[in-house]
Regions:
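Secreted/periplasmic proteins that engage bacterial cell-wall peptidoglycan
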Residues: 1-95, 99-104
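Aromatic- and glycine-rich peptidoglycan recognition patches
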Residues: 93-135
Length: 135
């Protein structure tokens, strides 16, 4: 998986040591829960579906793009599932506010369970999302 030009990530994505715990293997929630742990960031093992992460009690949520946060897409937002939404990990935030996310099981991109890919959003798009700050 190639990192898009002009963006960078702080740690290679290997998925080694990722656990299933309460999130099914290969789902977006499984990926973000484990990717955050690689940076010492904790999320509750019961955050719910992707769109539910933005509404989990006890977590700071902002519309300001934040590096190493979880970005919680509401149903149909940015191609998220209409019922469950989607969640991804913010790898990079540019000075202009555009973001690079990594994600797993984003079926619309032709990928599926356990498959990781990247997407870029412009600053204008990124301002419409919920960023959940881990602990």
């Amino acid at each position: 998986m190639e990192i898009p030009n002009g963006y960078s990530i702080d740690k290679e994505i290997t998925k080694e040591g990722y656990i299933t715990q309460s999130y099914p293997y290969g789902e977006c929630t499984w990926y973000v829960f484990n990717r955050a742990k690689e940076f010492g960031i904790q999320f509750d093992p019961y955050m719910g579906n992707g769109q539910d992460w933005a509404h989990k009690s006890g977590y700071e949520v902002t519309n300001t793009p934040t590096k190493h946060s979880a970005v919680s897409f509401q149903g149909r937002q940015a191609g998220g599932h209409p019922t469950y939404g989607h969640v991804a990990f913010v790898e990079d935030v540019k000075d202009d506010g555009s973001i690079l996310i990594s994600e797993c099981n984003f079926v619309q991109s032709g990928q599926g369970t356990g498959i990781t890919d990247y997407r870029i959003f412009s600053a204008e798009e990124a301002r419409n999302f919920y960023y959940v700050i881990g602990k």
